[in-house]
């Protein structure tokens, strides 16, 4: 590969770098493929864990990068990407809380910002040609920086397996901690961790205990429930168990609490954007609790038409996020409308955690539309039940006319 005629036209490229096997191989490949090309490594800290960042700069430089930029995006990710998404009620195909999908636009945006800062003329990612992420990243690049060249090595090089990558690095004396026996492909951030590959590729195989990393097995969770209280302001959690916390810190605390009770596991076969189906196991402990809490308060404060509208756009928003269309006018509009509704989502909620379940058992709100005096079956001075007769006649008028016309 190093003896091939080198390409020209790219002098400086910013690579989305994780330190894993793929991106470790991409750095020398870029240097060998493009003539006189400088590689800038970029890593987005979206809450994947401190252990993932230790030694990252040294590893990037040893692989041939001239610089490594690690950008802390944790608070911005939760505040400006997670909360706007869950405000719309978006859940992909009724189950998936979009953990990987939500992280891609902020990573792409930060990558473009680094590219502008260092004067790069190209960006590069390590996504495979079979997955969703290539579309998400490149869709964001197109929206934010259409002038930058996009390099996708997995669609260009001849390597096809982990063994190929390991041999490639060994030939160049580039050290890696990866091995050919890696079982699962994982992607982690503050919201969740995903698991794919290995025995999971056969949907008849039950996930082994070794798959899960954030949550205990529900059957092994404590035999006594735990109650966690959330204070919510404008659709965002501000306090956990009466402790004021930043958006990111609140999510981390809930991840820890809920994970101990086996909350937030799903095992799904989803429809990928590129046309194929894939199986994934996801853990979203804190996010599951947040979602349950916010939905409980919404039940108190949103009227029927508002909730109906929100349910209608939830599916559309889930596809926009999943398909990498974050930086589009429609996505921006749906978020703005949903956050307007969230202005009244204020109050307190108590979530019961028990063996994999997160259930809202107490809720209150200063904006509540629920009235015990209205809802009671007892006598009251507010609602005259006789008024229902006229309403019902008008409400059923079309049905009445249709029936008369068919006689």
Swiss-Prot record:
Q: What is its EC number?
A: 6.3.4.5
Which positions are annotated as binding L-aspartate? Answer: 128, 132-133
Question: Which pathway is recorded for this entry?
Answer: Amino-acid biosynthesis; L-arginine biosynthesis; L-arginine from L-ornithine and carbamoyl phosphate: step 2/3
Catalytic EC class: ligase
Q: Which Gene3D superfamilies match?
A: Argininosuccinate synthetase, chain A, domain 2 (3.90.1260.10), HUPs (3.40.50.620), Single helix bin (1.20.5.470)
Q: Name one GO biological process term.
A: argininosuccinate metabolic process
Q: Which residues bind L-citrulline?
A: 96, 101, 132, 136, 185, 194, 270, 282
Q: Which reaction does it catalyse?
A: L-citrulline + L-aspartate + ATP = 2-(N(omega)-L-arginino)succinate + AMP + diphosphate + H(+)
Question: What protein does this entry describe?
Answer: Argininosuccinate synthase
Q: Which source organism?
A: Shewanella frigidimarina (strain NCIMB 400)
